[in-house]
């Protein structure tokens, strides 16, 4: 087998988002768009979390939704997208020129996600598809994702079970005098991974990803960070306001603050002790 053929190989353990789930989400999107923006013609989804919600895969590209159809355009990786997503229409793209050539015409108003879209991305889209104005649909997308299906709730329950086991049952046994903040955080994170956590927490913020979370001892938990949350940490250093210090050791009588994220197949639970 040549090295190029490895691009389409994926583990047998892959669990795809059911096609029926994707179809329901797309139908709800069109229904809400017609309510809020009657006569809409085209929406372009670029944010990877929203792309995953509607397609079941996270790639570099764009999901174009119209009243009559939806196409996932993928620059990289097309093979992976075809393997992961059950969406029927997935096509390769080189740039937005590919979309412009395919659609030929475009509406005066384009519906996009303004919260995560960069000016550079909007300019590139407009270069090849010169619409007159764009309208933000972040609020609409958030309102759709707020209402969880039974499929989504089941994944959150699985995440919560991992959270409960690790933070309530294992953490008390792992907290011992002399352990560092960083060591405790990494150890708890590792236990979550062993039990099926997907290993990252995503939040609807400009810098919205955290991997390991935070373990803080004593007054370290009062050190404010840029993250909009109740806890704090000195971090590993000034440049990384997360995880905890590898040099701050637990002493007898100090309070322990833990905020270690957990999630399963894209769905999170939040637990702090």
What residue ranges belong to the model's regions?
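Terminal domain-start leader segments
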Residues: 1-71, 107, 150, 168, ...
């Amino acid at each position: 087998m040549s090295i190029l053929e490895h691009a389409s190989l994926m583990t047998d353990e892959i669990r795809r988002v059911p096609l029926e789930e994707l179809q329901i989400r797309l139908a709800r999107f069109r229904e809400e768009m017609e309510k809020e923006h009657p006569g809409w013609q085209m929406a372009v989804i670029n944010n990877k979390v929203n792309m995953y919600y509607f397609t079941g895969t996270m790639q570099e590209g764009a999901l174009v939704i119209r009243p009559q159809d939806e196409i996932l355009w993928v620059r990289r990786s097309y093979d992976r997208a075809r393997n992961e997503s059950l969406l029927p229409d997935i096509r390769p793209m080189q740039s937005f020129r590919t979309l412009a050539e395919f659609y030929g015409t475009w509406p005066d108003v384009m519906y996009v996600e303004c919260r995560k879209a960069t000016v550079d991305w909007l300019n590139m889209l407009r270069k090849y598809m010169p619409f007159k104005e764009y309208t933000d649909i972040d609020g609409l997308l958030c309102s759709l994702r707020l209402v969880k299906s039974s499929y989504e709730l089941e994944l959150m329950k699985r995440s919560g079970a991992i959270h409960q086991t690790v933070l309530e049952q294992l953490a008390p046994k792992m907290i011992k005098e002399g352990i560092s903040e960083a060591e405790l955080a990494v150890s708890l994170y590792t236990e979550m991974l062993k039990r099926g956590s997907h290993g990252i927490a995503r939040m609807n913020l400009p810098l919205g990803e955290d991997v390991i979370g935070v373990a803080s001892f004593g007054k370290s938990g009062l050190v404010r960070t840029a993250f909009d949350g109740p806890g704090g940490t000195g971090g590993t250093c000034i440049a990384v306001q997360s995880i905890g210090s590898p040099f701050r050791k637990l002493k007898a009588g100090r309070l322990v603050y833990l905020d270690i994220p957990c999630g399963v197949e894209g769905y999170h639970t939040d637990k702090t002790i």
